[in-house]
Amino acid sequence: MLSRAVLALVVLLPFSPNPAGEYSKHFGALSKLSIAVAEAMPPDQYGFRPHTESMNFGELIAHIATTNYQFCAGLKDSGPPSLPSPIDKDADVKFLSDSFEYCSAVIPNLTEEQLNKTHNSPDGNLLGREVLLALYIHVAHHRGQAEIYLRDKGIKAAVL
């Protein structure tokens, strides 16, 4: 009986889920919600800042995009690609969308070794799993800020 169990494991092992599957399965929703928030703000309000010490809305969206690239490049142990300097809503939304696409090409392909290895990130040297957690927290934190900017302008935040 034990040999059947071992045989079953040998046969099924190649079909086991990707080690990063637990992270990548939620990344689509994170991306869609964030892009929807960026798209919800009217172009003429991208310079809005709720407080003089706050980033304006466009800067906040660009900040999310920039750090997405930095976190995901760190997981590849490389520097981020050259990044644009968006000047309007369309450029900011594209920058954000492209950053999520970049990460979407990295995250599902991470190996168990990469998840357990230390990588450089905007939050310092972290294990790959911690880099992913920091990425998700960072996006959620700043997307939440962006939703407050929308509320200040009387705009309903996006919901999936």
Regions found by a protein language model. Give the residues of each.
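Short, contiguous alpha-helical
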Residues: 24-28, 32-35, 45-82, 120-160
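Membrane-proximal, proline-rich intrinsically disordered regions
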Residues: 41-42
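Sec-dependent N-terminal signal peptides
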Residues: 4-13
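Short, low-complexity N-terminal intrinsically disordered segments enriched in polar/charged residues
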Residues: 16-24
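Acidic/histidine-rich alpha-helical segments that form the ligand environment
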Residues: 37, 87-120, 126-140
